[in-house]
């Protein structure tokens, strides 16, 4: 049953909309006077009405100006507390504001004190420790194993500087040299008197004399278990081939590619770094730094196009069609491939070697890496084998 509009047919009076609880009260400066200051303007008022729990600055300033005008005083002549006390008005209006300002100042002082303390602690840490002379580090370096040189150089700058000296590398060579060591002529003691390329020569000699280093290179198989990925985006510096006559009735052919690997600094986009002292630049000189040699031996001669100066972008090793040998595929392009993109074979030069007998990769310190530049620059006509 529908209900009527009200008793005796009279319409109901409109209900008055009540303000929502918890909503902030809007303040107007012209409404602030001694007669319009409400309980909601004080700190102990209902927090549901005034969420801040403190008197608004606008209200306090308006009341302050009104009190001063009633007393006939200028704002710049009499302090606020005196004007309020002279007018007989309570000064509790600004008490909460003063308390908040004092609290903010206290927080700021604690923050500044904490920063000073942390800065002082950091300075103490930076100044902690003792700096030993270079002779101490040079003496300790005489007991360092070759495989621990990197860790030793990371102790401090003085330890790193010691590893840059000619005395360090000369003592390391003498410590591991033996009379029965099988060394090439360029790595003999009489050839170690020159400072130029001393570090590189000592490292090469350790792979002949030092057993842990020699054991590393003796385990390399004829065909690597996985395709080497360190040659990606390397630049081909040289290429040559030679005929190998062995126990087989038919000779084999050895194709050599010398690559210059991309510098680790370029990979990490880091142009700076520690450089050896100027007086030891000759000791650290190494023309073959970041270079390696890819050596592929095939059962017959294969024509190879000119790839010198190009970027090596793809290297795959698969099973040959006869299922008895391997097949090597090399792709060279004019520019490197970045961002994990796959190179397109139709855009570059493709080299296919099949059938392949062995694939070996030699770093610059490997005993089988060609050291003499004369051996690398043998005149070989392109497309014709040299017998």
From Swiss-Prot:
Q: Where in the cell is it found?
A: Membrane
Per the record, what is one GO cellular component? SCF ubiquitin ligase complex
Q: Tell me which domain of life the UniProt entry assigns to the organism this sequence originates from.
A: Eukaryota
- Offer one example of a GO biological process linked to this entry: regulation of protein stability
Q: Which UniProt keywords apply?
A: Membrane, Transmembrane, Transmembrane helix
- Specify where the region named Disordered lies, as residue ranges: 1-20, 99-126
Keyword flag Transmembrane helix: yes
Family affiliation: Belongs to the TMEM183 family.
- According to UniProt, the name of this protein is Transmembrane protein 183
Source organism? Pongo abelii (Sumatran orangutan)
Q: What high-level taxonomic lineage is stated for the organism?
A: Eukaryota, Metazoa, Chordata, Craniata, Vertebrata
Q: What is the primary gene name for this protein?
A: TMEM183
């Amino acid at each position: 049953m529908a209900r009527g509009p009200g008793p005796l047919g009279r319409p109901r009076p409109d209900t008055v909309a009540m303000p929502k609880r918890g909503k902030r009260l809007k303040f107007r400066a012209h409404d602030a006077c001694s007669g319009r200051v409400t309980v909601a303007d004080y700190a102990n008022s209902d927090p549901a009405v005034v969420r801040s729990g403190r008197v608004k600055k606008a209200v306090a300033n308006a009341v302050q100006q009104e009190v001063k005008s009633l007393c006939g005083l200028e704002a710049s002549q009499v302090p606020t507390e005196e004007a309020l006390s002279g007018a007989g008005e309570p000064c509790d209006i600004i008490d909460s504001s003063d308390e908040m300002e004092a609290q903010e100042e206290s927080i700021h002082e604690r923050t500044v004190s904490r920063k000073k303390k942390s800065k002082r602690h950091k300075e103490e840490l930076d100044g902690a420790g003792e700096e030993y002379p270079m002779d101490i580090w040079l003496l300790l370096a005489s007991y360092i194993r070759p495989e621990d040189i990197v860790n030793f150089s990371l102790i401090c700058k003085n330890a790193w500087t010691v590893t840059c000296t000619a005395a360090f590398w000369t003592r390391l060579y003498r410590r591991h040299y033996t009379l029965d060591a099988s060394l090439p002529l360029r790595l003999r003691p009489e050839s170690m008197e020159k400072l130029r390329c001393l570090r590189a020569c000592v490292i090469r000699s350790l792979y002949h004399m030092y057993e842990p280093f020699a054991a590393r290179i003796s385990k390399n198989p004829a065909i690597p278990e996985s395709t080497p990925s360190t040659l990606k985006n390397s630049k081909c510096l040289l290429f040559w081939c030679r005929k190998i006559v062995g126990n087989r009735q038919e000779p084999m052919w050895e194709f050599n590619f010398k690559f210059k690997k991309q510098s680790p600094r370029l990979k990490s986009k880091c142009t700076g770094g520690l450089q050896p002292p100027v007086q030891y630049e000759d000791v650290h000189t190494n023309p073959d730094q970041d270079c390696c040699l890819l050596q592929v031996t095939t059962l017959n001669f294969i024509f190879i196009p000119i790839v010198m100066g190009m970027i090596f972008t793809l290297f795959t090793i698969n099973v040959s069609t006869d299922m008895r040998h391997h097949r090597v595929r090399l792709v060279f392009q004019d520019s490197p491939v970045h961002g994990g993109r796959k190179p397109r074979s139709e855009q570059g030069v493709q080299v296919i070697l099949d059938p392949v007998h062995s694939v070996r990769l030699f770093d610059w310190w490997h005993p089988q890496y060609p050291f003499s530049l004369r051996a690398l620059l043998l005149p070989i006509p392109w497309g014709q084998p040299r017998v």
